[in-house]
């Protein structure tokens, strides 16, 4: 059971850690959660008994500890072989005569949805050197077309069924598997039948023909090109170093330029026939459908599939090589200086027993304990900004313990020594019982919360959990069983066992150290070897004290507030309660999410409390303000207070308000309210979190973005707001002026300003919830309200440019980007039009995908988005952008002009419109049943009562859009004389000449925008 991530809320590993782990899966990620330990993969045998589905009766209720831990004498289905963990009785398992394995279950969360996963036991580790990237290439070809589906038609079919490509239908390829995923929002019998037919055809008979290969080659190459970055290059070098001599070291799923360029239809077909076989396939389905019907559909569409030739043996994934190079220095100017250690051990199969899992839980406690000590040390001022440890059975190739360190400044030797000393202390000296109890309760709480919310676990989560478990030869259990097993292992979590676990995890048959620096250092390799091998003394004073921090440690608030107004809102059972101090509560007790309570607090005026020309360093606030503490409690004390509970401290800045949001529980939400209220009443000002925020900026900042994608991410949003300082990307020069005194001067009055609005939705009792708010926010003094000046409530769009603004990046010359944007509007008066603009953007987005990606392969991720700020009267825009090769930039501009002209000249077809409306119809039907949807729509209603009406009309505004509406919006807004554009090229590359934009003679109907007079500009 992988439970460490669920409990490690306190520790946020730096992105450097991701570089240590094996090759990133390519395409959309498939979430993995709650797998249990590893087991040998059982070779399916087609026998009469195997053909019959194993269909245990669903449990009547939560299984008791005794019942769930009792071993069953009945034959176990394929998923639970080699295991004594209690089976999740909701699943029904079976094996077809051809060896295909399946698992199905009924689940009505969300209602009417069915989630399907088809997992193929083939990934990049099955490729020969000359086949690098073939597994991923075939994933693309399978989605493109197959025996039963014409080229590109599967996407359109699923759109008509309400499934949005990239969200509801997608695929991923990893080192060890390829998984095809479809979530049908409203699964009719016909839609289910069609979807299983398409998926079966995809994996058994894709169109691997020269024409399709040539078309999709450009798409795969574009995906590879867009993924190139200093981080990805460092990841490749890291894996090659760590896993030297093993396939994992040099088998990235994306492949190489040479192998992708040289891939032929015959070679790809041979790879498919070798590895795409029914006996290497798992079909997992969960959803609002009869399991018997689902099983029959699996049999109907997959039974006739037969593998070509004998089943090939799996390649040998190798073992860590102790003789390989132990230290390495990588020069990477565009990534942070970092030090990474890895302790490698051979990966072996283990029977998936309760005892094995409970032993692993001791490992999790040991790692979490070290991570807490590292986090506390970093917060208190050390030579490292962040450090973390993690255990991973990487791609069934190694069992490894990873250490990642991000030093402050260039003194990486000191940072390495300090981190090793903290680990050494854990290796030598057993932790106290209080240390273990502190970590135990964190994981226990996370698992208990999973039990409390298990009735609303989505079908997509369930199939992803099962497929993820198969991926690494594990099983999965229900949340209550997982909690039982965890609690049953508590007796093993003794100080001596935790210490012994630490010693085992920080020992390996091969140990390696990697240093990443920004420039050449002739002595770095020798210094790394010395620092890595030097004996280390255990750290002193890193163990945490046992002083209890409770809610009583917080400063007291005043007397509970009195209610001035209590009335129903007239919608959804929401109640509006106004206290005498001006605080307003919107309360909706409901069971939509059992075990969850959502809390949202709004106050002040957000970005509008600052001038668009004022550099207020808003980027520093989320990571600094809450970490500064409350009253006399610093960050470490608050961590103790929050430990093992559904409590959090998060701060956000909206256009018109500051926010504090949390997802709590029925047991903890009252204390969550008190935390937020006390933060407003007794803010603490601490230099340490601010210093860490500044240090993080200095560590990660690059003067020039390191890729085209980075340049777009950093600059486009800021430039489309006409260089509004409130959203400006941070620079070290900004941080130099950011002192604690200045930070306090800016934020102390803003925390005290403006009436407070509280939303409380979820699993609460009405009277208790009202009392809790009265005792917290109702107890605050009445707050004044400084209304922002009119100039702060303006959002600008840049003036039109005759030639695109040129942005530079410092990456590959092959990487470029392009952006075209048109001003639209803002505010609430034209809210219906704003929502229909989003549908126009969806249609443009689909046309970009169909042409630039599917047909031409010019771009992998073209996009179109409409942004309409409801709280500003101006500043909205519709933007299209993409990454591509520099020489294709003129083509992008020409094609966008053609799309815009066509949309303005003629209505879209009924089918094209329906393929965009139907996914939105299904999405809104699901969203409107959620607390999160209504909270997001009604936020700010105490100041603007129109929010309720707008929320009620949202669905109709979106779904009633007509082809004539789309044409009118294109004519009104997508005009050459108002548009702004930019191109991104590598530093030193000359942008290509662009064709002249089409002229529109009539400018009388051009939209009103607040635009600056700035002309073309050059920016990094």
Please give the residue ranges for each predicted region.
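Bacterial N-terminal signal peptides that target proteins for export
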Residues: 2-14
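Conserved, carboxylate-rich catalytic/transport cores that coordinate ions
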Residues: 272, 650, 747
């Amino acid at each position: 059971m992988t439970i460490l991530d669920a409990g490690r809320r306190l520790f946020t590993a730096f992105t450097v850690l991701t570089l240590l782990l094996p090759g990133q899966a390519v395409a959309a990620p498939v979430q993995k959660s709650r797998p249990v330990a590893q087991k040998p993969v059982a070779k399916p045998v087609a026998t009469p008994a195997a053909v019959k589905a194993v269909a245990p009766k669903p449990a009547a209720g939560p299984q008791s500890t005794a019942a769930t831990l009792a071993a069953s004498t009945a034959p176990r289905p394929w998923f639970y072989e080699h295991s004594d963990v209690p089976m999740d009785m909701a699943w029904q398992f079976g094996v077809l005569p051809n060896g295909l394995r399946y698992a199905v279950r009924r689940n009505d969360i969300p209602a009417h949805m069915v989630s399907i996963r088809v997992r193929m036991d083939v990934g990049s580790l099955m490729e020969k050197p000359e086949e690098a990237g073939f597994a991923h290439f075939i994933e693309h070809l399978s989605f493109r077309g197959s025996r039963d589906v014409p080229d590109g038609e599967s996407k359109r079919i699923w759109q008509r069924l309400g499934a949005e490509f990239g969200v509801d239908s997608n695929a991923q390829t990893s080192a060890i598997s390829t998984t095809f995923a479809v979530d049908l929002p409203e699964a009719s019998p016909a839609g289910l039948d069609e979807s299983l037919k398409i998926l079966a055809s995809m994996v058994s008979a894709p169109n691997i023909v020269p024409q399709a290969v040539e078309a999709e080659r450009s798409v795969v190459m574009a995906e590879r090109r867009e993924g190139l970055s200093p981080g990805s290059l460092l990841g490749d070098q890291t894996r090659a170093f760590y896993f030297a001599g093993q396939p994992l070291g040099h088998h990235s799923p994306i492949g190489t330029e040479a192998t992708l360029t040289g891939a032929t239809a015959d070679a790809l077909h041979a790879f498919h026939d070798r590895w795409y076989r029914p006996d290497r396939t798992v079909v997992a389905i969960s959803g609002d459908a009869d399991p018997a019907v689902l099983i029959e559909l699996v049999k109907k569409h997959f039974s006739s599939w037969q593998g070509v030739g004998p089943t090939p043996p799996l390649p040998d994934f190798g073992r860590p090589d102790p003789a390989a190079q132990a230290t390495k220095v990588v020069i990477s100017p565009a990534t942070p200086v970092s030090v990474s250690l890895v302790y490698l051990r051979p990966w072996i199969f283990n029977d998936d027993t309760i005892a094995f899992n409970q032993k692993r839980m001791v490992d999790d406690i040991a790692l979490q304990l070290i991570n807490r000590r590292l986090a506390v040390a970093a917060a208190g001022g050390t030579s490292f900004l962040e450090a973390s440890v993690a255990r991973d059975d990487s791609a069934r190739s190694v069992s490894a313990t990873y250490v990642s360190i991000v030093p402050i400044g260039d003194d990486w030797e000191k940072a390495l020594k300090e981190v090793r000393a903290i680990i050494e202390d854990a290796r030598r000296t057993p932790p106290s019982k209080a240390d273990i109890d502190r970590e135990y309760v964190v994981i226990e709480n996370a698992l208990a919360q999973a039990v409390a919310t298990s009735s609303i676990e989505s079908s997509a989560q369930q199939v992803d959990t099962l497929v993820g478990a198969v991926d690494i030869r594990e099983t999965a259990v229900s949340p209550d069983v997982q909690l039982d097993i965890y609690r049953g292992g508590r007796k093993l979590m003794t100080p001596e066992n935790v210490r012994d676990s630490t010693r085992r995890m920080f020992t390996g048959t091969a140990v390696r150290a990697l240093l990443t620096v920004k420039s050449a250092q002739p002595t770095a390799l020798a210094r790394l070897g010395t620092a890595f091998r030097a004996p280390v003394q255990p750290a002193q004073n890193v163990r945490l004290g046992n002083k209890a921090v409770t809610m009583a440690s917080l400063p007291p608030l005043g007397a509970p507030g009195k209610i001035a107004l209590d009335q129903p809102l007239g919608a959804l059972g929401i109640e509006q309660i106004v206290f005498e101090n001006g605080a307003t509560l919107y309360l909706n007790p409901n069971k939509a999410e059992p075990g969850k309570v959502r809390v949202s607090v709004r106050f002040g005026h957000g970005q509008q409390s600052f001038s668009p020309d004022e550099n207020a360093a808003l980027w520093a606030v989320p990571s600094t303000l809450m970490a500064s503490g409350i009253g006399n409690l610093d960050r470490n004390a608050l961590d103790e207070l929050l430990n093992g509970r559904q409590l959090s401290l998060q701060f956000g800045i909206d256009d018109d308000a500051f926010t504090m949001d949390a997802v709590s529980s029925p047991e903890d939400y009252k204390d969550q309210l008190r935390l937020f209220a006390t933060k407003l009443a007794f803010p603490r000002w601490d230099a340490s979190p601010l210093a860490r925020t500044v240090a993080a900026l200095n560590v990660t900042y690059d003067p020039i973005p390191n890729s085209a994608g980075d340049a777009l991410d950093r600059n486009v949003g800021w430039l489309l707001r006409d260089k509004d300082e409130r959203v400006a990307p941070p620079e070290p020069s900004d941080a130099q002026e950011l002192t604690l005194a200045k930070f306090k001067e800016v934020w102390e009055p803003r925390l005290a300003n403006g009436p407070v609005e509280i939303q409380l939705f979820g699993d609460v009792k009405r009277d208790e919830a009202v009392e809790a708010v009265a005792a917290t926010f109702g107890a605050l003094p009445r707050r004044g309200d400084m209304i922002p000046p009119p100039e702060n409530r303006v959002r600008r769009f840049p003036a039109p440019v005759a030639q695109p603004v040129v942005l530079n990046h410092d990456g590959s010359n092959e990487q470029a980007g392009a952006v075209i944007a048109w001003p639209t509007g803002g505010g609430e008066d034209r809210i219906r039009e704003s929502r229909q603009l989003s549908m126009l953007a969806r249609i443009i987005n689909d046309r970009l995908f169909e042409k630039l990606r599917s047909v031409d392969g010019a771009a992998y991720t073209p996009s179109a988005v409409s942004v309409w700020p409801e709280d500003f009267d101006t500043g909205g825009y519709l933007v299209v952008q993409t990454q591509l090769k520099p020489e294709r930039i003129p083509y992008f501009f020409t094609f966008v002009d053609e799309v815009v002209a066509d949309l303005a000249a003629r209505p879209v077809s009924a089918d094209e419109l329906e393929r965009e409306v139907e996914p939105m119809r299904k999405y809104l039907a699901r969203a409107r049943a959620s607390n999160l949807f209504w909270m997001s729509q009604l936020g700010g209603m105490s100041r603007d009562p129109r929010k309720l009406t707008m929320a009620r009309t949202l669905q109709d505004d979106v779904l009633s859009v007509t082809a004539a509406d789309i044409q009118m919006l294109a004519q009104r807004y997508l005009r050459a004389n108002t548009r702004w554009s930019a191109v991104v090229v590598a530093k030193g590359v000359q942008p290509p000449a662009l064709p002249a934009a089409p002229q529109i003679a009539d400018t009388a109907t051009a939209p009103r925008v607040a635009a600056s007079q700035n002309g073309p500009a050059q920016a990094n």
